[in-house]
Structure formats: structure tokens, C-alpha cells
């Protein structure tokens, strides 16, 4: 079932259908049929095909106007009636002041024995961090021991998968005493120094999502290739189109994010841990559909310590993850 955009007012969620998003898809479908009909016409003339091919060809071109027209009407209706309300809601400046800015940090880890120790130490030594949790997703090396020695509380998530590891991070963080929760990876690609930036944004949002879009903040030798960079940006804009008026989104693949406890508690029943490498896009889409305010914050991005095992292993794997993200945004996430 397709999720719908929403706004949250006084604790209630007012659901607004994503007419612009649906209309845009119908316009693209109509134009696709039209251009297919034109190409078919060229081949029909070259091959000198007569009836019934001519009738099929003309029907394809003429009927392509129906989804295009309906799509234009839906998009126009959204822009005229719904967009102002969604944009007005998203521009409310202060959600709620944060009195205690200390955070609980939850790190995902899988066979990260080389990086998890330095990563935990980096977060433990930050003055705003009150607790570091590491969720070990059945590592076969010394990840558990190294994380524990560095000062983290370590738990093992036996069910494999990035989504299940992240979901367990959320559950463990909610068991701690703290109103602000950081989700991150234990591979040293992200640093604790960016916590200050994330916390600075949280008074304006329920969720602050890190973005690696700023070139000057990325190390030259990261696993984020040019293909991954622009593919990630494209999916971010698709998310923005789906939730038009709710914000600007440029990075759907970043694990690093700061979440208010009450927001995460609202989202937990809606999240599906079976969603794997595309879980971050699933999280953002679900948060926006639930009426949470989501803001992006530029963060630094560094080379990975150890061997990458996620969606950044290669461009081919990144393409597969990206396509699953697109399918989730268009047709809904498994179990949603």
C-alpha cells in the first residue's frame, strides 16, 4: 500500500495524499507511451507494416494522452491546494527547545575489528556523548572484544542484515536514558566532531540526517564513487518529489543521523527491519510519511578503515541498492 505525505500539528498527523508525486509518475508513463509510439511509427514505416499495426500504433499515441492529462491535473491540484499547507508546516522554525543536549550513540558493526575500537573511542571522548552502544551483527572477528575494550556496551544481533542491525540499534538506544539518539557506523567513515552540528539543528527538527553532498567536506579517497554520488542525489530528489514541500533531500544513504526519542518511538512500529541495505531511504520515507520533521546537515566523510561490506562495495552493487530504493519509494516498502 502506498504511504501518503503528512503534516504533524499539535501531536496529530494530518495525512495529505502525494498527488504531485502520483501525477508526475503518470506524466512520465504517458510520455513514455507516446515516445514508444513514435519509435514504433518509424519502424512501421521502414518495414511498411499495414493493418492492424497502423491501428495499434495510432491508438498507442492517442491514448498516451490520458495518463499525461490526468497526471497534469493531479500535479496542478497538489501545487494549488496541498503544497502551500505542506510548505507552511515544514517552515515552522522551532519544534521544541532541547534542554539536555547529551546523546546516546548506537553504532552498527560487522567484521569491523580494525575500525570499531578507534570509532568507539572517538565517540566516547566527545563531551556530549553519555553512552556508546555497538550492535555486532554476528561478526566472525574481534569486533565484539575491541568495541568492549574501547568502552562501548556491546550487544549481538544474530539475525543478519543491515536493516536488522540498525533496528536493533534503535531498540537498544531507547533502553538508555536520553532524549537524543545518534545512529552511525563503526567504520570510521563518520566522526564524532559532527555531533555538534547535528545537535545545533535538532531544535528545528525531529530527525537530523547527515548529508555527504558537500564536496569540500568529503575526503578525496572515499568509497563514494561519482556514480554513487549522483545516484544517491537522484534518489534523494525522488524522495523530495514524493514529499513535496516537506524539505530538501540530497543523501538517502547516510547512516549518520540524530533523532529525538519521542520521534523514534513513534516510528518504530512503522519500520521494517527486513529492509536491508536500503533501510536508510526506508527510514527517511517513513519518517516523512509519519509527519516527522526531517532536516539535512552537511557532515564530513572519511575513508573507511577495513573492508567495505555494504552498498558501496562496487558500482554494480550500489546500482542494485539504488534500484531497490526507487522501487520502495514508488511502490512501497516490504511489510509497509
Regions found by a protein language model. Name each.
Residues 123, 137-138, 160:
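Conserved short acidic donor-positioning loop in nucleotide-sugar-dependent glycosyltransferases
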Residues 136-144:
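A conserved acidic beta->alpha catalytic loop
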Residues 177-189:
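Short beta-strand-to-loop acidic/aromatic patch adjacent to the donor-nucleotide binding site
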Residues 128, 149-151, 290:
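Short, structured coil segments at secondary-structure junctions
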Residues 112-115, 139, 162:
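Donor nucleotide-sugar binding loop of glycosyltransferases
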Residues 1-97, 272-336:
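Hydrophobic helical membrane-anchoring modules
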Residues 77-128:
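N-terminal signal-anchor transmembrane helix
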Residues 158-160, 164-173, 180, 192-273, ...:
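Acceptor/aglycone-binding surface of glycosyltransferases and processive sugar-polymer synthases
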